[in-house]
A protein has these predicted regions:
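Cytoplasmic-entry segments and transmembrane alpha-helices of multi-pass inner-membrane transporters
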Residues: 1-10, 114-150, 238
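Alpha-helical transmembrane segments of integral membrane proteins
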Residues: 2, 90-128, 172-313
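Hydrophobic residues within alpha-helical transmembrane segments
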Residues: 5, 9, 13, 17, ...
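Hydrophobic alpha-helical segments of integral membrane proteins
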Residues: 8, 46, 50, 60-76, ...
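Hydrophobic alpha-helical transmembrane segments of membrane transport/permease proteins
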Residues: 15-65, 158-179
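Transmembrane helix irregularities
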Residues: 29, 138-141, 250
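An internal, D/E-rich "acidic patch" concept
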Residues: 57-113
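Membrane-water interface segments at transmembrane-helix boundaries in multipass membrane proteins
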Residues: 133-197
Length: 313
């Protein structure tokens, strides 16, 4: 249990440090939160009373402690611009972004694993060479540009979806999921291309090791050796990459949400930044950081399960 306890402690400490850095960064940004909430026409007495109420006169560490306790309890603060609870503002946005990134991840895995194995099994063949060329092109295209191309081709030319025709999950779940397919593809494509290349390289490297020759000597064919012996070892670095990609998709979805007019965390984050609505920005950044750190934590645990050289003791 030492390995699990160590990773869990690391997760908590990392989350604590990241939260403090985010809180401290917004604390030192020029501007008065009380003035932002009451406006420049507020009297000095009202401003002073609000500062006292918000605890702005307390030391930074004391303020962070109060904020962290409230955050854990679900109180993310109050929006400067809209004078409403941040929690209620982002509550409906979180499922949108999480669904988008989950679909992107599933598409990435569904494409990269079979294609990577096929290319490794037929290395040097015509299909393998074509996939390698296509991979290089896809990896060179930023996700937002992929989103624009997908919108032009599948939305405006082929009319497979209506650009900007987002359907809320509260209105129609099938319509909601259907609209997210193409944005998910835009996010997944570059990551899938990288995973294909990594898995192909990893499999080919494993195929050169002694235990593979031993497996062949026992009468196994290439397909049997690949799936029964090589894949378990070759996929370990790919799992690490997939975990990192899953975490990166949460941040990468911000731009894609703008391209496809999806009202997720990305839109409200950019709007809040332009409005200097720091409590909203702060809550979203900490939430994204939590998803990234928690994903890496799960990947570490899965890595231990896949690699027998790492023990829980």
């Amino acid at each position: 249990m030492k390995y699990l306890a160590k990773k869990l402690a690391g997760f908590v400490m990392t989350m604590l440090v990241v939260s403090f850095l985010v809180f401290a960064a917004f604390a030192v940004i020029p501007g008065d939160p009380a003035t932002a909430m009451l406006g420049t026409q507020a009297t000095p007495e009202k401003l002073a009373a609000l500062r006292e109420q918000m605890g702005l006169n307390e030391p930074l560490l004391v303020r962070f402690g109060s904020w962290a306790v409230n955050f854990i309890q679900g109180d993310f603060g109050t929006s400067y611009k809209y004078q409403m609870a941040v929690r209620s503002m982002i509550a409906e946005k979180i499922p949108v972004t999480l669904t988008l990134t989950a679909m992107s991840f599933l598409i990435m895995v569904a494409v990269s694993i079979p294609v990577g194995l096929f290319c490794a099994h037929h290395a040097g063949g015509k299909v393998d060479r074509i996939v390698l060329i296509v991979n290089q092109v896809i990896m060179a295209i930023p996700p937002f540009f992929s989103g624009i191309l997908i919108t032009l081709l599948f939305g405006l030319v082929l009319h497979l979806f209506t650009p900007g025709g987002y359907v809320s999950y509260t209105t129609s779940v099938t319509g909601f999921l259907g609209y997210l397919i193409f944005p998910s593809v835009a996010i997944a494509l570059p990551k899938a291309a990288m995973a294909i290349k990594l898995l192909r390289t990893s499999v080919l490297s494993e195929m050169k090791l002694d235990y593979v020759r031993t497996a062949y000597s026992r009468g196994n064919n290439t397909k049997g050796v690949l799936y029964q012996h090589v894949l378990r070892n070759a996929i370990i670095p790919v799992i690490t990459f997939l975990g990192m990609a899953r975490a990166d998709m949460v941040a990468g979805s911000i731009v894609i949400e703008q391209v496809f007019n999806i009202p997720g965390l990305g839109r409200i984050l950019l709007t809040s930044i332009s409005n200097r609505d720091y409590p909203v920005v702060q809550a979203i950044i900490v939430f994204i950081a939590f998803i990234v750190i928690f994903t890496n934590f799960l990947v570490d645990l899965l890595y231990q399960k896949m690699d027998p050289r790492i023990t829980l003791d």
